[in-house]
Amino acid sequence: MKSSASAPAKAILFGEHAVVYSKPAIAAAIDRRVTVTVSESSSTHVTIPSLGIRHSSERPSGGILDYIGRCLELYHDASPLDIRVEMEIPAGSGLGSSAALTVALIGALDRYHGRDHGPGETAARAHRVEVDVQGAASPLDTAISTYGGLVYLDSQRRVRQFEADLGDLVIAHLDYSGETARMVAGVAERFRRFPDIMGRIMDTVESITNTAYRELLRNNTEPLGELMNLNQGLLDSMGVSTRELSMMVYEARNAGAAGSKITGAGGGGSIIAHCPGCVDDVVTALNRNWKAMRAEFSVKGLI
């Protein structure tokens, strides 16, 4: 018996980290996917060719395998499985690889066991896995990997799908990743030491996100770049940027981008840039030292 499922990666446009503190965020599914295939086996094996992982144990653990192990504990019986993961995105890139993996694995397990859950239940169960593994996580990543398209997550944790023209966007990523759990914990520690200041920062991120949402609903992309720059300044204040991420952000702007910012947890990973009329120039500039691509978005979530 064999079953498969795939889920898209994501780019957070506005609101990362603030979303952990019940602030809204906007994210879009990108056309890079994680596909998981599970099949009967005499013992449990996990193979992830893109990461060079071949792992055999009843309880996979360590790094990205923690998400697989927790999914099996919660949503599978004790029978052994052969699990193969095909990833079109680098792990730890800030593009939601762990969420896409978790959603795809839950989808594959549901099909394997003949279960039929709706997207809301799937997203909630995937979010539980991320919380268990990371200690804290917003529901945004798992929501976008489940639903696809564009998602606005409001302050009440309600998912609102919407349509909008995002204009020309570029994503670039580093060769090293930031550890999401460590970055989230770092922001939490700064919040503990400076609660009033950090509270105001999160409130301002909320205002930026809601302004972007209103403009996107009007299909007005003109202010997106400036709003990204404002959001980036606040991410820097949270302590999640690095020297090289900042270099990427400014290289994109110097090449003509209207705005650019970290996308994801930071500490490594990726940036996103709004590049009206200058996508090729920005991609060329960023590719001199990093890896960049035009952002192609996916309307499809879990399939």
Swiss-Prot record:
PROSITE patterns associated with the record: GHMP_KINASES_ATP
GO BP term, example: isopentenyl diphosphate biosynthetic process, mevalonate pathway
Keyword rRNA processing appears in the UniProt entry: no
MF (Gene Ontology): ATP binding; magnesium ion binding; mevalonate kinase activity
Chain sites annotated for binding ATP: 90-100
A cellular component annotation (GO) from this entry: cytosol
InterPro entries, alphabetized: GHMP_kinase_C_dom (IPR013750), GHMP_kinase_C_sf (IPR036554), GHMP_kinase_N_dom (IPR006204), GHMP_knse_ATP-bd_CS (IPR006203), Mev_gal_kin (IPR006205), Mevalonate_kinase_arc (IPR022937), Ribosomal_Su5_D2-typ_SF (IPR020568), Ribsml_uS5_D2-typ_fold_subgr (IPR014721)
Main subcellular localisation: cytoplasm
Reported cofactor(s): Mg(2+)
Subcellular location: Cytoplasm
Pathway assigned to this chain's UniProt record: Isoprenoid biosynthesis; isopentenyl diphosphate biosynthesis via mevalonate pathway; isopentenyl diphosphate from (R)-mevalonate: step 1/3
Top-level EC class: transferase
Catalytic machinery residues: 141
Family to which the UniProt record says this protein belongs: Belongs to the GHMP kinase family. Mevalonate kinase subfamily.
Known partners and oligomeric status: Homodimer.
Function description: Catalyzes the phosphorylation of (R)-mevalonate (MVA) to (R)-mevalonate 5-phosphate (MVAP). Functions in the mevalonate (MVA) pathway leading to isopentenyl diphosphate (IPP), a key precursor for the biosynthesis of isoprenoid compounds such as archaeal membrane lipids.
The protein's name in its UniProt record: Mevalonate kinase
Species per Swiss-Prot/TrEMBL record: Methanothermobacter thermautotrophicus (strain ATCC 29096 / DSM 1053 / JCM 10044 / NBRC 100330 / Delta H) (Methanobacterium thermoautotrophicum)
